[in-house]
UniProtKB/Swiss-Prot annotation:
The gene is ctaB. This is Protoheme IX farnesyltransferase. The lineage of its organism: Bacteria, Pseudomonadati, Pseudomonadota, Betaproteobacteria, Nitrosomonadales. It comes from Thiobacillus denitrificans (strain ATCC 25259 / T1). InterPro entries: Protohaem_IX_farnesylTrfase (IPR006369), UbiA_prenyltransferase (IPR000537), UbiA_prenylTrfase_CS (IPR030470), UbiA_sf (IPR044878). GO terms for cellular component: plasma membrane. Converts heme B (protoheme IX) to heme O by substitution of the vinyl group on carbon 2 of heme B porphyrin ring with a hydroxyethyl farnesyl side group.
């Protein structure tokens, strides 16, 4: 009996964790932490690191859970998401709402009391931008949902910067612009090979409303824009030669994927492009951090 109770508790924990979309949240937290380190010449305080990381992670997880609550009917008709706890009936809407509220409230309280009020307010605005403006208003209404809603997804390094310094610096906005330009080709690559599922769900993603060829062209165009934007930190003196080389190589590879996708489409290639985009962003920010501590003048 005790063994069954333990197994049941473990299963329930897994169900709640599934609401948090931990793989997505991990990239959010990673870019936020990089923002903390880039904001100061040496190291941010350990208090800033642990409290900022935990607080931002909790609020990001709350936003993910709220997204699952709002989109449970959509998730039920998509192969990629139908195994989530809400479509399967493993959790109720009330349980999910309470869970999201506890996570979000705890994260905001931690940020306000241990980090600084600015970070708390920016994180709250990011939550509203994703969970309400993007999920509720933009996603079901316009094929430009990703472009407009990408502003909330681009905020994590700004949150990290604010956590470390208590201010919004123009260099933090460069990090914002990089993720903002990265978001459309990242999500449109996913939407291309999931276009039939999005169509069944009634979501106006770009491949559904404007067609495959149009979307492939815009993936390519945004990879070109992303390369240009990613070089801005070099132009402003924020980053040096090490970052320059890394940004050019990573960006050129992303453009290569975009060009290949534009010329001849396959679901497999779109899937590889999507996966590369995740690796690209993580690697770009890691190289920027390395350049920060081991600068080589351009």
């Amino acid at each position: 009996m005790e063994s069954l109770m333990i197994q049941g508790a473990a299963c329930r924990c897994q169900q709640f964790l599934a609401l948090c979309k931990l793989r997505v949240v991990s990239l959010i937290v990673f870019t936020a932490v990089i923002g903390m380190f880039l904001a100061v010449p040496a190291w941010p305080s350990w208090t800033t690191i642990w409290a900022g990381t935990l607080g931002i992670g909790l609020v990001a997880s709350a936003a993910a859970a709220f997204n699952c609550l709002i989109e449970q009917k959509i998730d039920a008709v998509m192969a990629r998401t139908r195994a989530r706890p809400l479509p399967r009936g493993e959790l109720t809407g009330t349980q999910t709402l309470v869970f999201a509220g506890v996570l979000g409230g705890s994260g905001l309280l931690l940020l306000h009391t241990v980090v600084n009020p600015l970070t708390m307010w920016l994180t709250l605005a990011t939550f509203v931008g994703y969970a309400v403006i993007y999920t509720v208003l933009l996603k079901p209404a316009t094929p430009q949902n990703i472009v407009i809603g990408g502003a909330s997804g681009a905020m994590p390094p700004v949150l990290g910067w604010a956590a470390a310094t208590g201010e919004i610096h123009h260099d933090a906005l460069l990090l914002f612009l990089i993720i903002f330009a990265w978001t459309p080709p990242h999500f449109w690559a996913l939407a291309l090979y999931r276009r039939e599922e999005y169509a069944r769900a009634g979501l106006p993603m770009l491949p559904v409303t404007h067609g495959e060829a149009y979307t492939r062209l815009h993936v390519l165009l945004y990879t070109l824009l992303l390369l240009a934007v990613s070089l801005l930190p070099v132009g402003t003196g924020m980053a040096g030669a090490l970052y320059l080389v890394g940004a050019v190589l990573l960006g050129a590879r992303f453009i290569q994927y975009g060009w290949a996708l534009h010329r001849e489409y396959s679901d497999a290639l779109a899937r590889r492009t999507f996966r590369y985009s995740i690796w690209y962003l993580a690697a770009l920010f890691a190289i920027m951090l390395l350049d920060h501590y081991f600068p080589i003048p351009v």
